[in-house]
């Protein structure tokens, strides 16, 4: 079984993406062939253990928004890769425990957002602009769950079909022009609202730790992180993390 993991890690997210690949590889105890697709303005391969299977996909983004809006396009670029499943993971996701692939396999897979039954218990953060392709009305009669934009995937053909639809939605909204309330996450929620995922990963059972920026200040603003990458390349064979804006070791 071949599983592809696509990570967007341009600019300040570069060391966080390296951390995700390194720690995913360390804690993964399954039997699938895992290949990482690392979308960035800098090649990460020299900073990672030699045995990790990584393909570098050059991306240049002038802003966080430009980066996050390239998500579907980058996933669609994997069409000719020899993969059975494809998953997207945010670069600032951390891995803190052992896991295998079984818990996340499904035809289409969505992850419940950690705010779904907390801050969004009574009202979801859906896009409410009727002109947008991400629109979900307040009076929808369909079941409501708010999904993460930080993690989704499924069988290759299903994931590519989903991304093709969302890319078309995004392109049409940009002609208005309109940017949905929560960017690409708004399209993901609209898609899953009308096409529920075959498998939902409850937040209580989620194996990863999303939105862990490692204490890097203003991570959405492009800035140099060479003070981190210099440490990473010297210690790439260790189990390392980023906490309090510095590289730490376990």
Q: Can you annotate each of these PLM segments?
A:
Residues 17, 47-48, 97-100, 163:
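Short glycine-/acidic-enriched loop or helix-start segments at secondary-structure transitions
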Residues 6, 37, 55, 87-89, ...:
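Hydrophobic/aromatic beta-strand patches that form the interior of the parallel beta-sheet core
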Residues 1-67, 80-82, 234, 249-250:
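N-terminal anchoring/stem segment of glycosyltransferases
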Residues 71-120:
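GT-A fold catalytic core of metal-dependent nucleotide-sugar glycosyltransferases
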Residues 138-243:
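Catalytic core and acceptor-binding pocket of nucleotide-sugar-dependent glycosyltransferases
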Residues 68, 72, 92-93, 181-188:
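Conserved glycosyltransferase catalytic-site signature
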Residues 38-46, 92-98, 204-206:
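Short, polar loop motifs at secondary-structure junctions
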Residues 102-161:
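PAPS-dependent sulfotransferase catalytic domain
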């Amino acid at each position: 079984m071949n599983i592809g993991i696509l990570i967007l890690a341009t600019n300040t997210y570069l060391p966080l993406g390296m951390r995700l690949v390194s720690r995913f590889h360390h804690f993964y105890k399954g039997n699938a062939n895992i290949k990482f697709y690392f979308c960035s303005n800098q090649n990460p391969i020299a900073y990672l253990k030699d045995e990790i299977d990584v393909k570098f996909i050059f991306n240049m983004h002038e802003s966080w928004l430009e980066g996050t809006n390239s998500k579907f396009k980058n996933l669609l670029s994997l069409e000719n890769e020899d993969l059975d499943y494809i998953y997207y993971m945010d670069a600032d996701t951390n891995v803190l425990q052992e896991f295998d692939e079984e818990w996340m396999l499904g035809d289409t897979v969505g992850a419940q957002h950690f705010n779904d039954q907390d801050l969004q218990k009574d009202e979801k953060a859906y896009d409410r602009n009727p002109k947008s392709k991400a629109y979900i009305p307040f009076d929808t009669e369909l079941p409501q769950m708010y999904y993460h934009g930080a993690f989704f995937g499924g069988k290759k053909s299903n994931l590519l079909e989903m991304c093709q639809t969302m890319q078309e939605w995004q392109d049409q909204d940009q002609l208005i022009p309109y940017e949905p309330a929560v960017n690409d996450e708004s399209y993901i929620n609209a898609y899953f609202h009308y096409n529920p995922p075959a498998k939902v990963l409850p937040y209580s059972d989620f194996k990863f730790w999303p939105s862990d920026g490692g204490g890097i200040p203003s991570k959405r603003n492009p800035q140099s992180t060479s003070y981190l990458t210099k440490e990473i390349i010297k210690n790439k064979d260790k189990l390392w993390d980023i906490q309090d804006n510095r590289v730490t070791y376990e």
